[in-house]
């Protein structure tokens, strides 16, 4: 067993950097050092820093294939979240919805379920792995989403939408951890950009298709078509998706070696914990981090705010184009392309610049990287988002239809830059506890995505599109313009004071 000890003793820089191993509420308790392994010949870790089974050492092509596959799972659920927007009026007539809040609830209740999923799916992926959870949750989502198409009462629709949303929340809860499993800090920006694109583009692509489905078919086909797409993603995942959670891979290695050697004393560095114990801490740690960590608190608030505005925009788009600009549902749905194009432009520049800026600033700092080197993306994105909101709000109904689209495009450009900057900043700041920090963000983000569309019609009825959207823009200025500079200066001190932060 001495060879086993030598080969599996190294915590390795890869694993050390995989402080991102935590994808749920309970992390590996401590990273084993070389001395730990020397004292414990039964400890199973990676075979040094270059272990090919460590996901961070996989060939780049394999890592990108896994990243894109995870992103497909992340993409399909947000498509379903907003695809019914162009069909809400037909759906309301069919199921007897009369109050505005009921109509918008049919869209946003799906997002409410997103606040529950991360609490369960994060810790469950610690025990059962990323792949199994992604596939099982997708089947759950598919079944209930299919049921929405057969709903005969508004109560059934609300219940089925909520249950479908719970399954659809799993990729959003697990995806960020899966990305950090495979990529180092210097590489992570591009991968996180691809991952971020799913939640941002999904709600945009959905209404484009939903508009034509609503115009030429019935609202029921909105649900049936997304279920067919989810089935296609399931098939792709079956063939392409590979387990990348280091803790799960090391447990499999331990089981294989125990079978080969007959040594049942072999073990990994993880604590053996039940799902119930993990669930308890899954709820506890995100709450603690949200209430005690200024970085998590501020990033969660701003991320949730931008997410809420995005869903407010998705929900109110159909009325703007069909009522104000007198377009058909199908043509009106095409206006969502402005958000998609803006997202692509924002992602393109971030992919080109975010990791380059990080490496440049790291080189100037004697090769030492800091999470604060993600702040330029947030600063620039916040300014762009604010400009987009003002442009969008004051051009509705007062100018040619292209002008609100340009405003929405500018807002989307800035938003994806902000989201990517905030997500990578949190992952870099709380590597070991990144998933708990992201879970706190996800819960608040989902609550805003649920709530903002519900007050949107009342806000616009009272203030109009110009002043209503300007109110949102002024809040973006206050929060988004100041936060990047505050964390650039005070972030290192806040992290030094934190028991959760790294670096």
UniProtKB/Swiss-Prot annotation:
Any one cellular-component term (Gene Ontology): membrane
Gene Ontology annotations of biological process type: viridicatumtoxin biosynthetic process
Statement on biotechnological application from the UniProt entry: Viridicatumtoxin and its derivative, viridicatumtoxin B, exhibit anti-methicillin-resistant Staphylococcus aureus (anti-MRSA) activity. Moreover, viridicatumtoxin and a C2 acetyl analog, spirohexaline, have been demonstrated to inhibit bacterial undecaprenyl diphosphate synthase, a potential new target for antibiotic development.
Location of the protein in the cell: Membrane
Gene3D superfamilies tied to this protein: MFS general substrate transporter like domains
Residue ranges crossing the lipid bilayer per the database entry: 68-88, 101-121, 133-153, 162-182, 194-214, 221-241, 295-315, 329-349, 377-397, 401-421, 432-454, 471-491
Region (Disordered): 1-59
Known function: Efflux pump; part of the gene cluster that mediates the biosynthesis of viridicatumtoxin, a tetracycline-like fungal meroterpenoid with a unique, fused spirobicyclic ring system.
Protein name listed in UniProt: Efflux pump vrtL
Organism of this sequence: Penicillium aethiopicum
Gene name, Swiss-Prot/TrEMBL: vrtL
């Amino acid at each position: 067993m001495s060879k086993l000890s030598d080969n599996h003793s190294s915590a390795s820089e890869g694993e050390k950097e995989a402080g991102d191993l935590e994808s749920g509420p309970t992390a590996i308790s401590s990273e084993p050092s070389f001395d730990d392994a020397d004292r414990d010949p039964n400890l199973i870790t990676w075979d040094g820093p270059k272990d090919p089974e460590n996901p961070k050492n996989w060939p780049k092509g394999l890592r990108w294939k896994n990243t894109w596959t995870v992103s497909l799972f992340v993409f399909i659920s947000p498509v379903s979240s907003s695809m019914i927007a162009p069909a809400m009026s037909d759906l309301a007539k069919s199921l007897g919805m009369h109050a505005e809040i009921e109509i918008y609830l049919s869209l946003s209740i799906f997002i409410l379920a997103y606040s529950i999923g991360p609490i369960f799916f994060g810790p469950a992926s610690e025990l059962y792995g990323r792949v199994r959870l992604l596939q099982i949750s997708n089947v759950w989502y598919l079944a209930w989403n299919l049921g929405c198409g057969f709903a005969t009462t508004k109560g059934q629709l609300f219940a089925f939408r909520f249950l479908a949303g719970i399954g659809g929340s799993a990729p959003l809860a697990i995806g960020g951890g899966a990305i950090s499993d495979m990529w180092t800090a210097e590489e992570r920006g591009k991968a996180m950009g691809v991952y971020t694109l799913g939640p941002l583009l999904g709600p945009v692509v959905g209404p484009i298709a939903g508009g034509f489905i609503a115009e030429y078919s019935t609202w029921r086909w909105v649900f049936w078509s997304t279920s067919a797409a989810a089935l296609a993603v399931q098939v792709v995942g079956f063939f392409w998706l590979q387990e990348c959670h280091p803790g799960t891979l090391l447990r499999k290695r331990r089981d294989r070696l125990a079978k080969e050697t007959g040594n049942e004393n072999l073990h990994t560095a993880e604590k053996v914990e039940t799902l119930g114990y993990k669930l308890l801490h899954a709820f506890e740690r995100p709450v603690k981090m949200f209430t005690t960590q200024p970085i998590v608190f501020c990033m969660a608030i701003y991320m949730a705010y931008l997410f809420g505005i995005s869903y407010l925009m998705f929900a109110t788009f159909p009325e703007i184009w069909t009522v104000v600009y007198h377009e058909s549902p199908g043509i009106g749905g095409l206006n969502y392309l402005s958000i998609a194009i803006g997202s692509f432009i924002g992602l393109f520049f971030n992919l080109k610049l975010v990791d380059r800026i990080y490496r440049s600033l790291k080189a100037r700092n004697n090769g030492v990287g800091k999470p604060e080197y993600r702040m330029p993306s947030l600063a620039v994105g916040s300014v762009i988002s604010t400009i987009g909101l003002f442009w969008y709000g004051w051009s509705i109904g007062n100018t040619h239809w292209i002008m609100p689209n340009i405003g929405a495009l500018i807002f989307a450009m800035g938003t994806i830059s902000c989201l990517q900057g905030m997500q990578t900043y949190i992952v870099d700041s709380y590597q070991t506890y990144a998933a708990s920090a992201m879970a706190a963000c996800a819960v608040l983000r989902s609550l805003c995505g649920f709530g903002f569309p519900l007050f949107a019609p009342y806000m616009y009825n009272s203030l109009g599109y110009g002043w209503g959207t300007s109110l949102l823009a002024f809040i973006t200025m206050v929060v988004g313009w100041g936060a990047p500079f505050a964390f650039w200066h005070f972030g290192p001190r806040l992290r030094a004071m934190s028991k959760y932060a790294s670096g």
